[in-house]
Each structure stands twice: as structure tokens, then as C-alpha cells.
Curated annotation (Swiss-Prot):
It comes from the Bacteria. Pfam families: Aminotran_5 (PF00266). The gene is phnW. Its EC number is 2.6.1.37. PANTHER family: 2-AMINOETHYLPHOSPHONATE--PYRUVATE TRANSAMINASE. It comes from Burkholderia ambifaria (strain MC40-6). Involved in phosphonate degradation. Homodimer. This is 2-aminoethylphosphonate--pyruvate transaminase. Belongs to the class-V pyridoxal-phosphate-dependent aminotransferase family. PhnW subfamily. Keywords: Aminotransferase, Pyridoxal phosphate, Pyruvate, Transferase.
Amino acid sequence: MPDPILLTPGPLTTSATTRHAMQHDWGSWDAAFNQLTASVCADLVAIARGGDEYVCVPMQGSGTFSVEAALGTLVPRDGVVLVPDNGAYCARILKILGRLGVEAIALPFGEDAAVDPAAVEAAFAREPRITHVALVHLETSAGILNPLDAIAAMCRQHGRRLIVDAMSSFGALPIALADSGIDALVSASGKCLEGVPGMGFAIVRRDALDACEGNSPSLALDLQDQHAYLRKTGQWRFTPPTHVIAALRAALDQYLAEGGQPARGARYAENCRTLVESMRALGFAPFLDASVQAPVIVTFHAPDHPAYDFRRFYDAVRDAGFILYPGKLTKVETFRVGCIGAIDAGDIRRAVAAIAQALESLGIAMQRVSADA
């Protein structure tokens, strides 16, 4: 029986080539593996258009490990971090800062509203103590895209440091770090690069990283120490996820062969268009306005029907070969469908057909939703 297609924001469906890359064992101190790490890091900086200003620091674990590593390493203990908050992953950053004992100021927005750069600027005026901004580029709770370039410009203008969680955007959406003023951009292997989960990374400005020696309260999550050791020896400080890195190397080779960010972004955008149009035809209304919808994951309102139960709906779709994602909003019942991974518009159409069959099996009839809804 074939594996189900994962319509999630990660882990996601990977290619056979990427999975095959994990069939070989690597010595973590061997020169060939060191070269593998170096080549992956070089490509990640190039994808971020970082130039010589930036270095890539890989880190074991999920993306959240690298987010915490970046915050713990780059923000001094007496720093004050502004966190624009429009979803669960923004809230996670606030929780991390709380555990680190760093003062954080939440700037709340609605779950369906992008971060407003003018509100960020107003917060700088109200709170001159703010030293850093921690921004989630693509808040996957709803799939909302926040205006990174405008906020980066605002931070440059006002002399604030910017750390970006680009977990679900890096590789699919255009990002140019050079001359941006961004201190660090964080992402992970198992998202839009279509690798497998297990490695995060921070692409960090060299001068910002070099100034942080001894700042991290953690040994394992010290980006500066990790980078210094890699630079000196070519090796990771502690056991690396060798198979994950080999899979990411294979995934990056496919990414570059596909055409890099423009081609990956175009495929995901077509997946997203196909998904939204097909789901509207079934009667599902997207939660977000199209102007702020990122082509990575789409949140839909759950059916307003007494027979609807997410678990039964999920199981019916899974039995047809597709894995959906539960909603993560606080005020309305929703579910989410991912557009990313080694999938195309044909897979999306088959998934929507499976959703239609699931509705029929549950006895749920819905009316087509217009594009204006």
C-alpha cells in the first residue's frame, strides 16, 4: 500500500530520491560528511541571498530548536524583544523568551490579519527600550504572510535588530538577506526545501554572531559555539543527524534542478490556486482573505453541519490516501490543507475528490462558495 500524501506544513511528502539518500551510513567525523555539511550550508546561504555577510549554522532537532537557539544566542539577557503576534507560532516565541528570562512585548493582531508595519513603528515610539523584533514571516496557524521587507526596513530605520522565523516560507518565497539588516533567519530541513525533519538552521550575520560569544544560556543551543567549532574543525560539536543531512543534500539538488525558489514558489502557488478553487466548488470557504494568503497552507472553515466531526472527516480522507491537518485557531472551527511537498496540482485535485467522498460518507451536503466569500 503506498504511503499517504501529507497535506501538511511539515513533515511533508518527500521524493523517492530524497528518501533513498538515507539508505547510506555516514561517519560524523569523516571528511566526506564534513564536506556534505559544508555544501548544504553554502547552498542555504545562497538561497537566502546572504552573500559574504552571512553564515549558516546548522542545529540538530526540529525548527523550534533553532528558533530558541537564535533567540538565546543573539538576544542579550537585558534585551527587550517585540513580538508581533498573529498566531500560535508567534505565541511560541513569546513562551521561549519567557523561559529564557528575556523581556518580551507582545504586539497582538487578529488571527486573520497580517502584521502592520505602522503598528511596529508605533511600538518603537511607545517602548524605546525595545532592542529586537522577533517576526514570524509566515504564521502557519492560518497560513498568513507577514510583510517581512517592510518590517525589516522599519527595523533598519529605527536601529532595532530583527530575528525572523522563516520556517514555512524559506525556499518557496523570495527572501534576500544581503543589505536587509536582518540579524538571523531561521528555518528547517523538513519544510519548503522538501527534506525530512530533524535539522534546523539559522542564517546569521557574521558580525552579529561573532559578538555573541558566551551569551547563550544553553550549551546545546549555542549558535555561536556551534559555528566556531564548525569553522575550526568542519565538524558538529555533538552527534549530527547524518541521514537527515544526506536527505537534505539530495533535496537541495532537486530544488536547484527544478529552478530554485522561483520554480518551487510557482509550483506551490499553482497547488494553492487549485486547492482554493476546488474547495470552493465543494462549499468550503477559506479563512483568510486572498491578499494575505501564503501558498503554503490554507485554512478552511469547517462545515456548519451537525454531522461534521473532524476526527471522522480526517479518518475518511486518510483512508483515501491523504493526511490533513487540524485547525489551530482559537475562535472558529477550522482545518488546514497544505500545498507544499513533493506534490503537484494533480495530487491536490485527487485530494479534493477524497474530501468530497468523505463529505458524502458523513452525509454532509454543502453549497458552492463564490470567490467573493
